[in-house]
Amino acid sequence: MLPQRPQLLLLAGLLALQSVLSQECTKYKVSTCRDCIESGPGCAWCQKLNFTGQGEPDSTRCDTRAQLLSKGCPADDIMEPKSLAETRQSQAGKQKQLSPEEVTLYLRPGQAAAFNVTFQRAKGYPIDLYYLMDLSYSMVDDLANVKKLGGDLLRALNDITESGRIGFGSFVDKTVLPFVNTHPEKLRNPCPNKEKQCQPPFAFRHVLKLTDNSKQFETEVGKQLISGNLDAPEGGLDAMMQVAACPEEIGWRNVTRLLVFATDDGFHFAGDGKLGAILTPNDGRCHLEDNLYKSSNEFDYPSVGQLAHKLAESNIQPIFAVTKKMVKTYEKLTEIIPKSAVGELSEDSKNVVELIKSAYNKLSSRVFLDHNTLPDTLKVAYDSFCSNGVSQVDQPRGDCDGVQINVPITFQVKVTATECIQEQSFTIRALGFTDTVTVRVLPQCECQCRDASRDRSVCGGRGSMECGVCRCDAGYIGKNCECQTHGRSSQELEGSCRKDNSSIICSGLGDCICGQCVCHTSDVPNKKIYGQFCECDNVNCERYDGQVCGGEKRGLCFCGTCRCNEQHEGSACQCLKSTQGCLNLDGVECSGRGRCRCNVCQCDPGYQPPLCIDCPGCPVPCAGFAPCTECLKFDKGPFAKNCSAACGQTKLLSSPVPGGRKCKERDSEGCWMTYTLVQRDGRNRYDVHVDDMLECVKGPNIAAIVGGTVGGVVLVGILLLVIWKALTHLSDLREYHRFEKEKLKSQWNNDNPLFKSATTTVMNPKFAES
């Protein structure tokens, strides 16, 4: 599968090139070549002298390469710095698994610089192995076997490497409730079997520094005694943190570092310390005193993420040797801790050597390429091209599995800066291995223009040419440094170029030259920008039929408003100046109840188009015309004395007119008038035709109504009394009959049932026998 790797690299490079070429140039407030380069990876700058025309801003020089070429900029005058990478290979004679040793990147904002990193797994690389064991009481059988493992462990390491060392440490838990029993007797001997000798509980004890002496390992481990605690989870993460944070005390070399973690139970993590009133977060520092973690009761347990970061920082690969019931738990843990493995430990730890060998082979055959923490302005992505044919693109870290000894694999690293950055460095390394790649990052934001030595006369002798643009001396401004400031600051000059104290100079469409706006020439054909603050143009008006102001034959655009010719009107000159469609049969425009706009009536409220007549479903103002109808026809009512003045706009018709609205209203004397309203042109103007006859209804008989009402009330009262009397009589009759029945059922004699006789007769039993 190896021949595919160059093809994949070529494909990735072509895709990256296509992505860059397809980018556009989005610019904002660009006046220098540096501003242009910072605007985006697709931007380029034309340094050609006099490239911009009259009224064109300097930002015209900034565009895509294709656009600049089309505008007449020679290819040699286009400044387009690229991101690039320079590598320095490892020194000869050094055994390096990772190359190159150093890379220098020149980064343009938004444009990635790519370089290749090669990893070649070496055979026999030195190994340090630290055995960290749980000494809670349930591990008593395991401790007995581990005491004999010194020679086997070193022999297993020597099968892999020529330089192997082993060390030993142990842990139990924090020595406060509820983790251990704090009774003095239990602290001396925490084991459930009092006859068995146990050591007091402790958090972590560093027993043996890393050594290649197997006898010393067996001797020191042989001195260890089992201990005990209360709860099931152990303080293993506390111990692992100290092993990672104390490299000098443990004796770690700058080689492959393995940490074997042997236990038969779970683990406490951050937050559990609150159960023992331990609130201070773990600080991730070394706190060993006399090889004991004596500050255990002062700091909480570390979090899993904190421990993972510390292990990766210390380049330590943990191997979790756990019993069967705990395998799934620690497999979840390995998903968070990179470069870690899990092995199933037998109940008495007899298989620990084979477990370590298997886990090491698994760890060393998988390579993770990662980097240290970077600022937000730098982004790193990895493309992995593995020897087994598997490829991954644009991942947050490199990842290859099944890596074989002496078979190189390639990672492509792509680094992108989001802005012009300061010079800085970071390192890339393969997790679990000691080799690193140092990456030095420098900004690529300046243009190497060739006009630095040109004659100052181009800028009127008051400035110098930089990348085709005049950089004026103090006291002068302008495109050719033609404007003298006379002591005024640039802010004061720009103030007169801001409309309504806006923050935008010349509406963003011009340059402020000597305190006056010089409007830009637009790229849009036939568009003209003008106005004191360049706030106007001749295209930003309403459109009709796809044209501004309906086209030049209808009107022209002036600063956002259409000015129509004599034959047209409307906001977009869309209407002819005609009222033909607004005239009624009498030739009155909109019946006098609206305005004619675009040959269509815009009616007043209460009327409807097309000619502003009464709404068919709307109410008729009959009541409002009743007083005028009464005075005009019958010469009476509230307007009888001034009828001609009050009802001058209402005409009395002698004969009915078809199409009128029928009304029926009461007059001042309560009689009904029937009349017809006929609408005339204008607002609230009606003619009226009134029927000759009034409908006057006789008044009601008040005496009859009052007498009937009083009589009805009296009769209803009498009827209610009769009904009440009848009901009470029936109730009394029913009670009397029941009493009679009870009387017949009773049996009485002449004796009082409550009387008790005062005489008592007692019989003598002896007398009866005789």
UniProtKB/Swiss-Prot annotation:
Q: Which domain of life is it from?
A: Eukaryota
| Residues that, per the record, bind Mg(2+) | S136, S138, E234
Name a biological process GO annotation. phagocytosis
Molecular functions per Gene Ontology: amyloid-beta binding; integrin binding; metal ion binding; protein kinase binding
User: Which subcellular locations apply to this protein?
Assistant: Cell membrane; Membrane raft
PTM annotation (Phosphoserine): residues = S746, S757
Q: Which UniProt keywords apply?
A: Calcium, Cell adhesion, Cell membrane, Disulfide bond, EGF-like domain, Glycoprotein, Integrin, Magnesium, Membrane, Metal-binding, Phagocytosis, Phosphoprotein, Pyrrolidone carboxylic acid, Receptor, Repeat, Signal, Transmembrane, Transmembrane helix
Per the record, ranges on the Extracellular side are 23-701
State which residues carry a glycan (glycosylated). N50, N116, N254, N501, N642
How the protein sits in the membrane?
Answer: Single-pass type I membrane protein
Q: Pyrrolidone carboxylic acid occurs at which residues?
A: Q23
Question: What disulfide bonds does the UniProt entry report for this chain?
Answer: C25-C43, C33-C447, C36-C62, C46-C73, C191-C198, C246-C286, C386-C400, C420-C445, C449-C467, C459-C470, C472-C481, C483-C514, C497-C512, C506-C517, C519-C534, C536-C559, C541-C557, C549-C562, C564-C573, C575-C598, C582-C596, C590-C601, C603-C612, C615-C618, C622-C663, C628-C647, C631-C643, C671-C696
Residues in domain VWFA?
124-363
GO CC annotations, alphabetized: cell surface; focal adhesion; integrin complex; membrane; membrane raft
Q: Which residues carry this modification: Phosphothreonine?
A: T759, T761
Q: Partners and quaternary state?
A: Heterodimer of an alpha and a beta subunit. The ITGB2 beta subunit associates with the ITGAL, ITGAM, ITGAX or ITGAD alpah subunits. Found in a complex with CD177 and ITGAM/CD11b. Interacts with FGR. Interacts with COPS5 and RANBP9. Interacts with FLNA (via filamin repeats 4, 9, 12, 17, 19, 21, and 23). Interacts with THBD.
Q: Which PANTHER family match?
A: INTEGRIN BETA SUBUNIT, INTEGRIN BETA-2
Free-text function comment from the UniProt entry: Integrin ITGAL/ITGB2 is a receptor for ICAM1, ICAM2, ICAM3 and ICAM4. Integrin ITGAL/ITGB2 is also a receptor for the secreted form of ubiquitin-like protein ISG15; the interaction is mediated by ITGAL. Integrins ITGAM/ITGB2 and ITGAX/ITGB2 are receptors for the iC3b fragment of the third complement component and for fibrinogen. Integrin ITGAX/ITGB2 recognizes the sequence G-P-R in fibrinogen alpha-chain. Integrin ITGAM/ITGB2 recognizes P1 and P2 peptides of fibrinogen gamma chain. Integrin ITGAM/ITGB2 is also a receptor for factor X. Integrin ITGAD/ITGB2 is a receptor for ICAM3 and VCAM1.
Record family assignment = Belongs to the integrin beta chain family.
Q: What is this protein called?
A: Integrin beta-2
